């Protein structure tokens, strides 16, 4: 301890590195009895035997997968020598430093696994106070194990330690003495005590210093991997000096009593199972203490065993320890059997214990029996050992006798007392007595926490003893552990039969002593698999039961059991269990502590454990189902996977948790990106096929993660579970408490039935998706691989098409979806998963994801690239897929339309929707399932409807493509996303799916409304199509901007883990939805998928109930949707038709398909028109109809022309910079604004540009989709896109330029927000949102308003914008991309990452140049409203002509013709910019309305307006999103342009009116409304500011006012948005422009990326904030700056905080000074809540409710120090002088550096500020007044004035000045 921490750390690092090199890849422990394989890989002999015994026939090398046989194993003496030397070094290190190397090592490892968590723990837990605090918590919580665990977990970051802590802390009074004794490590007694105490306690202590939480984890890890090191160090440190002979004796004892040792291990194990639950249940506090002591002893013993395993040191240290522990072991040996028996009973009892908190009575006996036998034995042993330290072997008999004599708790206490006495009496006895007790207790506790872990230690000990009896011990221990774990689980499980079986097995295991175990290794292993199977079954139930009972604890047990199950191989299982326990314990604690858990999940260990745990639990289910198929193989596979993972495990070896975690880590790591690759690689044995599948389809990787399909199922579930497992485990435990209770028993059945269902479903899906595989995946090999991999996978693969996640989740489906029965459970899981995972993982994983995202994204991109390419081939099969999907959907649908459909689709879509559903379900079970249903329903609907049929095919194709794309991406991305990055890919996948699902969900919700019936067919198909397109684009964009978005979105989405991760869109949705609500999320998703749908629903829905949305989304959406649902539907229908067609066209859809699609689309347009016309939403509908009416022709022409044009545009856009031209201008703006997102913007711009090329093609689609995405814009887009299409068909440039304009705007927006696509989609989304409210205004105002109102909308929009930036861009881009070309997307996702990056960069440059040109044009037109608009019109037509003259011509020709028919006026405006200009001139109101008009004009002049709308929206959005320069510039430009272009806009309105006339009264109405609103726009403007402020409400209000149609339209159709928005928005926009400063400010605020600093938060809390910030695209900085917008303070429930520098600076700067609860509540509600409700109200010094922050924020124009000259003189503590000066400057004072610099004059009041207590000279500050004529006040005057934001009177702060003479 004397050594400098750095030096010690360096040495430790070196030792760690050496240790890592010498670790067994399987057990991640130092290699014991190293054996080498033919492939020259070194493993522990025991591990290899365990591996070889795990399955019959040749096993595979975990590292290289070469076949291994026992005969091929050769002992490697050189490694054993190295290990011995390393142990000696570690021992020496421990002795020299007084540090337990193993602990720190373990800690380091664990820290690596859960760095944040452990580090936090270390920093926090290293203090005894904290430990005591934890102890106190534990003691206070012990009655409620789960609560204890939870609280402890919460308190203790290292949840792994929590249990041990609880137990240990209960024991800690005793341990205190130990700790005290530990303090005297140097003395031999102390060393012995310390050995015992030190080893036991020091493990605890040092672990505790490292983190009480780490204690268990460390102990476990210590046991697992570092145990030998740590224990060796500790033991060596403490024990080696004391008893070297004892070491020998112990070794001998170990040799002699491997059984006993194992018995003790088993006992411990059994005690552990008993104790685990007992502990979890809070065995009696006495028992807990005893158990803790025993655990410690076990730990020590384990450590000793570890050391024993470890050659040299192990022997020397372990000789002593072995003697002690052998004595303990001997003591325990009988008790082992008894314990085994006892444990069998106690396990059952312990089940009850878990259920009963005071089960100690039962269990204590059993536990006591086990520990007791051990305790008595240990006492006797201690006595004997006391007499003969070296003859510990003899005392084994005593221990046996003692063990057999089951003492009672009192006895245990006595034993403990005796142990304490012995500890006091003799080191050896202390070691033994304490060791048995502590080892037992620790072990029990660990066993409780980590039954397997202790056993792993024992196993390790066994391994250590393996030289003599280590392998037998290990095997025995392993089996015991496995059995014990299983027993523990089964017991916990309430499956007493199994428990009995386990008991029998345990007895057998007990009977299997180390020697026996070697011989019976196969038996043990076989039994272990059986037990594993039983345990699996039990554990499945148990896991659920455990989840129910003790989420954390039982999860641990479950994890252990699961791990055992997963790792049939004893060693692997043991080590994995040990690691798993380490993780499982932390995990269970983690589960208890969701946030901590999240942190822990960030740590990756707990999460993985949890993942595995739940995976295991589910895994068991899956194993049950698959167990019959794959249970043993999965175990073997898992072991192989572990073996395979060994390299990873080696990596993870760092974390001793890694062993168990390894499987878990494999899964979890698969879940998590880094581990995913390696572990997947490592899992290749079983997962090789899976991996192939995975590679082809990441989902398979996800599935692979489980290690077997069974595992996959479980892993899927587990992952599904795991991600949510943190939160979900909590919730799920709660949810599952019921569900698991049911499912605990059902899981197998559910799994079985589920699997059968899945099989059936898969059969259905296979049949329906058998086409899909090919269709869905160009790479059918993936499917075959999947199919080859596992039935479930194969089934899943087909499902993959339907829902790749389904494959993943079909295993889950087997568990989750398959068991529709389980679906409740699944729902529970999914919900927790979606909610909790989204929420928890979002918090936790987000960090990990940020790190993992990049790699994972890369991986997913790689995968998705392949998959995307695979998707590329899908277009040919869309109809198949469509039909199949449709058939499947129909079959699903035919079943319970919603429930069955939900279920089947859930299962089917479970892959997709399950991810989605998880998030979606999280958002909306019904919605989620409807999403599922809808997902298939859309296809079904599409299929049902003629247009649905063709479009379905198209849609299906898109769907297939999208699904394929998304599915591959989803799986490529999602699978990994399911892992950590999978969140991101899941984002795209879920985004797609969730989008689709949410869209469809919304549609289902909508379809709940009339529109649902009408629109669902269309919408779902559209959704599917758009969804797919969007997904495709999302995938593309996700791929392209995946890193950016993923980092941003994924991070953000990670926040909403699944939801957000679920989809980029969902991220938006999640963010928006979190901000707005899940429904909004759905809508956002819809918006992304079908922004029109989304927007139509969103604008109305959003506008109406951005906040309501979540809760009222169904109602409101239904109402709003009812209002605009037709629009949605029509848009969707239209969009699916046009979009689908266009998308299909873009996406390589054959012309016939397009024609059919177009025809059908036209038909469907007619139908849609009819439907929509008939629909109440005739505005939207009519508008859509008008759009559509011409649209069918236009669409036909457009679709065909669009095909040509789009493809033309594609090539042209790639080369064309017409859009690029426009993009650059915005991009300049963007770059100005989005300088912080330049790479994104650039990349997105590039992507956008690239996408634009796609988008040009796709722009029709994507603009249709995007525009359609913007419901208004959708309609506008329809109109305008039909304009565009017609124009674009007429003039590709038109589309391009209109789209370009739009795209430019989009791009600008996209640039501002993301690629223009984001801008487009987001803009559109925002437009549609804003269109309900006025995009700019709504966005800005809405953002403002929302920020003010609830930040929901603001956040939604902001997030939406931000999310949308990433996700809208993703959505739009992806939409566009997908629309344009599924294959394009596929290739683009590849290309995006490579060529497109370059292309996009080039395009960006071009765009910038063109933007400059555009700006010049805009400026020219900016001088003239008409010209300005013409510039926009140029953008639309002029730009079409200018940018795409050739295209413009052709497009314009078509445009003209089509436009004439479609939008005569619109055509005129578009065709004739003059008209527009005239109109522009006509309405100057439009000026004010400009944004609105622009928005409305987009509605009116779709291409023109869309362009401009996009443009202005872009401006607005840009402004909104990035209120920075671009916003200002844009706002100014846009407003100028708007003002100048207001005429054009008005004309647009005018033109739009005719169009409306053409389209119908609603349009006229909306047009009139627009017009009347235009004129009203002034009044409206008046209310527009309101609207602007009310943002969504205006839209809603306007929508409600201009209502119904208007709302529908404003929400749905640009017209309404026009009318409403024009009235409201134009007004709003005008108000925006009028309020432009405010708007700018608010826009800046809203659009300006929020920047947060935190103050007073713990690392765990900071991590939550970090994840929250990532989720919501908020910049999180360490220091407060001018850009900072929010200061997050740690407050109490009354929002009272401590005063910190950031607090003062936040108030002085008028920042939002909000409570940390704002973050936590926002995370809980999955949306950014309004800061108003969480603003800090006071502080502990100035008052608890002085409202200073609010006063400051609202009084920035009234600076409190205005007119003051302040000199901050002299030293100041706690804050730099410059910060103090900045503070007073922010408050309006002028700062003077020197006293002599005061300005003498009137109006200026000098003040000198000093801090007297900072002065070293007492009187120095008293003479300051002599140097200047200024009052001298204390710094408190400044601080109080700032805190209260009221200039305080100087009197009370004046410092009396001493006369100069005194000075």
Swiss-Prot record:
Single biological process term from Gene Ontology: sex-chromosome dosage compensation
Question: Which stretches does the entry tag as region Interaction with PALB2?
Answer: 1397-1424
Post-translational modification (record):
Phosphorylated in response to IR, UV, and various stimuli that cause checkpoint activation, probably by ATM or ATR. Phosphorylation at Ser-988 by CHEK2 regulates mitotic spindle assembly. Phosphorylation by AURKA regulates centrosomal microtubule nucleation.
Ranges for the region named Disordered are 230-267, 306-338, 650-739, 896-915, 1181-1216, 1322-1395, 1440-1505, 1565-1642
Q: Where is the composition biased (Polar residues)?
A: 705-716, 1373-1395, 1444-1470, 1610-1624
Q: What is its EC number?
A: 2.3.2.27
* Location relative to the cell: Nucleus; Chromosome; Cytoplasm
Q: What is the lineage of its organism?
A: Eukaryota, Metazoa, Chordata, Craniata, Vertebrata
- Protein role: E3 ubiquitin-protein ligase that specifically mediates the formation of 'Lys-6'-linked polyubiquitin chains and plays a central role in DNA repair by facilitating cellular responses to DNA damage. It is unclear whether it also mediates the formation of other types of polyubiquitin chains. The BRCA1-BARD1 heterodimer coordinates a diverse range of cellular pathways such as DNA damage repair, ubiquitination and transcriptional regulation to maintain genomic stability. Regulates centrosomal microtubule nucleation.
Chief location of this protein within or outside the cell: nucleus
Task: Report the GO terms under cellular component.
Answer: BRCA1-A complex; BRCA1-BARD1 complex; chromosome; cytoplasm; gamma-tubulin ring complex; nucleus
Biased region (Basic and acidic residues) positions are 248-260, 327-338, 727-737, 900-909
Description of how the protein assembles with itself and partners: Heterodimer with BARD1. Part of the BRCA1-associated genome surveillance complex (BASC), which contains BRCA1, MSH2, MSH6, MLH1, ATM, BLM, PMS2 and the MRE11-RAD50-NBN protein (MRN) complex. This association could be a dynamic process changing throughout the cell cycle and within subnuclear domains. Component of the BRCA1-A complex, at least composed of BRCA1, BARD1, UIMC1/RAP80, ABRAXAS1, BRCC3/BRCC36, BABAM2 and BABAM1/NBA1. Interacts (via the BRCT domains) with ABRAXAS1 (phosphorylated form); this is important for recruitment to sites of DNA damage.
* Protein name listed in UniProt: Breast cancer type 1 susceptibility protein homolog
